[in-house]
Amino acid sequence: MKFIINLHYQLGQLLNYLQSPALLAARLYVAWVFFAAGLTKIKDWDNTLLLFQYEYQVPIIPPELAAYMGTAGEIILPILLVFGLFGRLAGIGISLVNIVAVLSLSDIPPAAYNLHLVWGAVALPIIFWGSGRLSLDAFLEKRYD
């Protein structure tokens, strides 16, 4: 029994050590996905505006404002995630962009829907545990704590 308890403890220590690299990987993955989407929107802005006017059904706000806000979120929030700056807020923001994207598509294919679920799930640890030790958040916390 003592062997199992020690093994469990050592495994916990290893996983604690790997938490920050795992959070970094999560931040980089989510940032890459959303930043690429934002660049696509910027690259063909006229088409982006048409999509927001006729394809996406963003609730409450006008289509043009939704296009600007969504694109800004897809460009700015990933940069914050890469550097681990305001990681929890950036994770929440990315999650909101993700949720609005799913809600605004009336006929989202199952594969695309599943990808949005994955991106949301990957963002959750960032929201709950922050950016980790490999981040500007950790640097600033040490400096100003």
Regions found by a protein language model. Name each.
Residues M1-K43, I60-A72, I76, V82-D145:
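Extended, low-polarity transmembrane helix blocks
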